[in-house]
């Protein structure tokens, strides 16, 4: 599963994990991606989205219809 949020566009970040002795190792910071299924009244069907925790909060505030409309406007197939 790709670590990419369909709502916010959050992607993995890269950096270092630093030990107590300050030795650095490359690591990847993944967003908190969840697979969520929503009922979309305007489409009259369920839509499964890969969303981050922040994306879930965005859907709660803006509403699923507005979020799905913006995703479809970008040309993403649901």
Curated annotation (Swiss-Prot):
One Pfam entry name: Ribosomal_L28
**GO BP terms, alphabetized:** translation
What are this entry's molecular-function GO terms? structural constituent of ribosome
Which InterPro entries does the entry mention? Ribosomal_bL28, Ribosomal_bL28/bL31-like_sf, Ribosomal_bL28_bact-type, Ribosomal_bL28_sf
Q: Which GO terms describe its cellular component?
A: ribonucleoprotein complex; ribosome
Statement: the UniProt record of this protein carries the keyword Cell inner membrane: no
Q: Which UniProt keywords apply?
A: Ribonucleoprotein, Ribosomal protein
- Ranges for the region named Disordered are 1-31
Give the UniProt family note: Belongs to the bacterial ribosomal protein bL28 family.
Q: Which PANTHER family match?
A: 39S RIBOSOMAL PROTEIN L28, MITOCHONDRIAL, LARGE RIBOSOMAL SUBUNIT PROTEIN BL28M
Q: Which HAMAP family match?
A: Ribosomal_bL28
What name does the UniProt record give this protein?
Large ribosomal subunit protein bL28
**Organism name:** Pseudarthrobacter chlorophenolicus (strain ATCC 700700 / DSM 12829 / CIP 107037 / JCM 12360 / KCTC 9906 / NCIMB 13794 / A6) (Arthrobacter chlorophenolicus)
